[in-house]
Regions:
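Radical SAM/AdoMet-radical enzyme domain recognition
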Residues: 27, 32-53, 60-186
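Short, solvent-exposed loop/turn segments at secondary-structure junctions
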Residues: 11, 57, 86-87, 109, ...
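Canonical Radical SAM [4Fe-4S] cluster-binding loop centered on the CxxxCxxC motif
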Residues: 1-33
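Flexible mid-to-C-terminal extensions adjoining Fe-S/redox cofactors in radical SAM and related proteins
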Residues: 259-337
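A C-terminal junction/extension of Radical SAM enzymes
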Residues: 174-269, 310
């Protein structure tokens, strides 16, 4: 599902944010003209589901008009708003439309303050309890620290009777951290993740990875058996908590200036103009050729060289951003020969 970045602005300043290249660095909003061009481009291949992202998309002064335009557009099959939830009360008539889904990234009151947290909870109360949006609202949490107190998300999930939660194992800031031992990075997160899963199991919630899924090889046989028995308890056709796949596909985020990036994790790697491509699938194919193909070829460690899952393109060992510098080197060499 392609996304449109409506604004670089955000009303929060989360230290772990993966979009720090853009967010709050400048006050750029997408223009009405560029928004319309982006939608026309995204729907050239037929009906599509559109994601609205930021920054915080609800900060855009034309957010209401954008929503109404998408709702009335027959080529837009659905809309997902990615939001921190602080301003949802301003747009209830648009948000509750059957076409709309909402993913609320829930931050701890220890980070954003009790007042902001209370506002988000009140907004969720209205949408879920008054407008019965339980099946069209997902909550998410960014697992950025092994010391994170996530009791607040457990309370919200129980408050609304939700049984799924989006999780993102955040990545380091690749621009400042240098080389990272990828497998060790995930191994260092294992104990925390297992406890998180066990606590979620205790309230009958099954998480799912947004991206940056740990390679399955970091888990011991005992840990894999527990994960598989955990997932098997729940009536879902599949769960990405288990299985040998540790990979992702290009999302395609369109920026306010009509440049596109593969995803925010690779946003500083390369940007292309949508005007140079016929449609979203063509941009995705370009990024697969430039980025993904090399990500599978590059081993995270010596053990990965003979890994069957890597060789059949089932595993990139988590976020492709871990390998961005190496991919740059590969592409530069290919261009030189």
């Amino acid at each position: 599902m392609p996304n449109i970045m409506l604004t670089y602005r955000c009303n929060l300043h989360c230290s772990y944010c993966f979009a720090n290249e853009f967010v709050n660095k400048e006050k750029t909003d997408i223009s009405l003209e560029n928004f319309q061009k982006a939608i026309e481009f995204m729907t050239r291949s037929g009906e599509t589901h559109v994601g609205l992202i930021g920054g915080e998309p609800t900060l855009h002064p034309n957010f209401q008009n954008f929503m109404e335009s998408l709702i009335s557009n027959q080529k837009v099959s659905g809309i997902t708003v990615y939001t921190n939830g602080l301003l949802l009360d301003r747009y209830v008539p648009q948000i509750v439309h059957p076409k709309v889904r909402v993913l609320v990234n829930c931050n701890s009151p220890q980070i954003i303050g009790e007042k902001a947290y209370s506002t988000i909870r009140n907004n969720l109360d209205v949408l879920i309890r008054d407008y019965y949006m339980k099946d069209r609202i997902n909550l998410g949490i960014n697992l950025f620290s092994n010391e994170l107190d996530y009791s607040y998300i457990m309370e919200l999930l129980q408050r609304y009777g939700l049984y799924r939660v989006r999780i993102s194992v955040t990545v380091p800031d690749f621009s400042v951290c240098g080389d990272v031992d990828i497998l060790q990075y995930f191994k260092d997160r294992k104990a925390f993740l297992l406890q998180f899963f066990k606590d979620m199991d205790g309230i009958q919630v099954l998480p799912y990875y947004d991206c940056n899924k740990p390679p399955y090889c970091v888990w011991t046989d005992e840990e894999r058996n527990w994960l598989e028995s955990y997932v098997a308890k729940y009536p879902v056709s599949e769960s990405n908590l288990v299985g040998n796949h540790s990979r992702c596909f290009p999302v395609i985020d369109i920026l306010p200036n009509l440049q596109a990036v593969r995803c925010f994790g690779m946003s500083d790697f390369e940007k292309v103009s949508i005007q140079d491509y016929e449609n979203v699938p063509d941009i995705a194919s370009y990024f697969i050729n430039q980025i993904d193909s090399n990500a599978y070829k590059l081993s995270a460690c010596e053990k990965c060289r003979s890994c069957y899952e890597r060789m059949i393109r089932h595993c990139t060992a988590g976020c492709i951003g871990f390998k961005a510098a190496q991919i740059h080197t590969c592409n530069a060499y290919i261009e030189s020969i």
